Amino acid sequence: MQFDQVSVGKKANVFFDGKCVSHTVTLPSGERKSVGVILPSTLRFDLSTKEVMEVVDGTAYVSINGAAEVAYTAGQSWTVEAGGYFIIRAEQAVHYVCHFG
């Protein structure tokens, strides 16, 4: 996967004491995405906007809005609507792209 002709935020977005690190990418259309990595941990994300999380590498074990945990691997994705949440468990580094909206 590759994004062409984009603007990349120089400063990293660092969450959960460094367990989740990403950079914001803005496409020519103005659409924003973030490209990042989640290090081994279990984290909860509460969402104010809809997100589609796409796994690029690794395995993410995800519970959406309290549902049973599901494993997602490279090339798979999950969607959470605004106002929802997901809990992600990473046993090894999980590389991802977050598509907003």
Question: PLM features: residue spans?
Answer:
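General beta-strand recognition
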Residues: 33-34, 44, 61, 87, ...
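Compact, glycine-rich, soluble single-domain proteins
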Residues: 21, 25, 36-45, 62-64
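Ligand-binding loop in jelly-roll beta-barrel domains
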Residues: 81-101
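Short solvent-exposed loop/turn micro-motifs enriched in small/polar/acidic residues
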Residues: 16-18, 38, 45-47, 71, ...
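A short, N-terminal "cap"/entry segment at the start of jelly-roll beta-barrel domains
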Residues: 1-31
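Short acidic-glycine-tyrosine-enriched beta hairpin
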Residues: 65-86
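A structural signal for the main folded, soluble domain(s) of proteins
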Residues: 41-44, 49, 84, 101
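Short, conserved beta-strand element in jelly-roll/cupin
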Residues: 48-62
